[in-house]
Design a protein with these regions (language model features):
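Carbohydrate-binding surfaces of carbohydrate-active enzymes
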Residues: 1-270
């Protein structure tokens, strides 16, 4: 719905700049690079079983979702939302009370988004995070902190010094707002920090970045690891604990060898 609403909305530089799908994939890739256990969900799902929810460019906010997001954070979850989020409701009508999402989400995130700057390619906007300088790309929201902690601020233009990224404790959890579009390098750094703060460990430790790993839990509580080699070369790595190779039926192993573009399924009994 957010994609359709964005595409039907004039402004924001046109659909060639909005790039909703590319943005979602980029955030997913940044989390995937940390070998996190990921799931793609919609806003109607049960949020309670997750520690961290990332909502990039959630432009359209259905009725009742803001209350459920507040409940999720209040109960200990961490929510990360980005620029161009919660601008319209399910009827494509703007929210009263300011962005993001009117009074409810303004309270949750502790910010007010006054405006959004569409960055021309020749304009360089930057911000600093964890001692490193990063480039803003395409979009930079002009934010005001209303109780939120400023994690990063802009370095230039008329809104220099205003927040680019914020965080606010709410109940037992935390709401983080990324008001700027960035390259993958920042997202990888940022989500690495956020995953650690949330206590989310990698699915498997020390897995090469060239491998894709996902985990699912069986009805008996056993853990199943689906591992794909995404390279044209052989990959070898040592497992952090013994696992049964049920795909190749080679029994319990402690070291995995995958051929080029190979795959396997490993099982850990409970």
């Amino acid at each position: 719905e957010s994609l359709w609403a964005l595409d039907s909305t004039n402004g924001f530089g046109g659909n060639e700049v909005k790039q909703y799908e590319k943005t979602v994939v980029q955030h997913y890739r940044a989390l995937w690079k940390h070998n996190a256990d990921l799931a793609v969900i919609n806003s109607d799902c049960d949020f309670g079983k997750y520690k961290l929810i990332v909502a990039p460019m959630l432009f359209l906010l259905k009725n009742g979702v803001s209350e459920r997001l507040k409940e999720f954070v209040r109960n200990g979850g961490t929510l990360a939302m980005t620029y161009l989020s919660a601008y319209v409701d399910e009827h494509n009508a703007c929210f009263f009370g300011g962005n993001p999402g009117g009074p409810d989400l303004r309270e949750l995130f502790g910010i007010w988004s006054e405006d959004i700057d569409g960055l021309e390619p020749q304009v360089r906007q930057t911000f600093d995070f964890n001692g490193k300088r990063y480039d803003a790309v395409d979009y930079a929201e002009f934010l005001h902190a209303e109780g939120a902690e400023v994690l990063a601020a802009y370095n230039s233009e008329f809104y220099a010094g205003s927040p680019a990224i914020t965080s606010k404790c709410y109940g037992k959890g935390k709401a983080v707002y990324i008001g700027v579009r960035t390259e993958l390098d920042f997202l990888t750094e940022f989500y690495g920090t956020l995953l650690n703060e949330c206590g989310i460990s990698p699915v498997l430790a020390n897995v090469p970045e060239s491998l894709s790993v996902s985990r699912r839990i069986g009805t008996d509580g056993s853990e199943y690891y689906f591992i794909l080699n995404l390279t044209p070369g052989k990959q070898i790595f040592r497992l952090p604990f013994p696992l049964e190779d049920i795909w190749n039926k080679t029994g319990e192993i402690t070291k995995l060898t995958l051929p080029p573009s190979g795959s396997t399924v490993l099982k850990r009994k409970q």
